[in-house]
């Protein structure tokens, strides 16, 4: 797609996909319907996570309907669409040593970013400044955020998915930060809360320590074979 390359940059292309990824072969999307038609001829079903791409859903369903008629006539052909999510979830459940190392790197980098933001926080700082500190650290290490960062001061910290991050923090406020990074497709996810002026009030400290105790107890309960 020449136009897309001009606007958005180079495309891997069919040849690049076949060479750069652990797959048997690659084909153009323009040939998708023809390839699916051919593949369905001697298949009993189709594995597809639907509602991710309307165009692909339409092609598969159209081909499936056509081949189902063939099955009624000749006794061969697909009968259903199967959601492979449970199979893929099981495959993703156990990580390889190399995957674990990447996950550790992602977690370490996110932890670094949170620590830096804590040290640079003061009672006149704005939420977006904290966001910039954290995400800037991610980018300086060749990473990127794994989800839109949440930085809420005061009452904003009580909003579960607060993404505006556009208010200034006040003296005495607690700041909640939910931010993680992604390395090679593996994401970290860390939430921490700290006082804007560097010192908890008695009530803040009491609640903070209560939550901290609960978190430590939950971590200690994470053993092989433990139920959720």
Task: Identify the residue ranges that each predicted region occupies.
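Active-site neighborhoods and metal-handling regions in enzymes and metal-associated proteins
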Residues: 1-228
């Amino acid at each position: 797609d020449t136009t897309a390359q001009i606007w958005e940059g180079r495309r891997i292309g069919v040849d690049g996909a076949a060479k750069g990824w652990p797959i048997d072969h690659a084909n153009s999307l323009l040939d998708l319907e023809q390839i699916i038609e051919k593949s369905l001829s001697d298949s009993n079903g189709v594995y597809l996570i639907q509602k991710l791409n309307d165009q692909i859903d339409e092609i598969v369903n159209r081909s499936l309907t056509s081949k189902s008629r063939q099955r009624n006539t000749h006794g061969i052909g697909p009968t259903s669409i199967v959601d492979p999510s449970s199979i893929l979830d099981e495959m993703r459940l156990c990580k390889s040593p190399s995957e674990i190392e990447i996950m550790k790197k992602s977690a370490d980098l996110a932890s670094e970013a949170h620590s830096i933001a804590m040290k640079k926080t003061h009672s006149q700082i704005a939420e977006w400044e904290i966001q910039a500190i954290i995400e800037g650290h991610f980018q300086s290490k060749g990473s990127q955020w794994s989800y839109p960062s949440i930085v809420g001061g005061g009452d904003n910290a009580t909003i579960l998915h607060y993404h505006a991050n556009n208010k200034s923090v006040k003296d005495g406020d607690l700041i909640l930060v939910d931010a993680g990074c992604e390395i090679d497709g593996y994401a970290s996810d860390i939430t921490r809360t700290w006082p804007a002026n560097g010192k908890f009030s008695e009530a803040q400290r009491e609640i903070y320590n209560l939550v901290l105790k609960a978190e430590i107890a939950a971590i200690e309960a994470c053993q092989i074979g433990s139920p959720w």
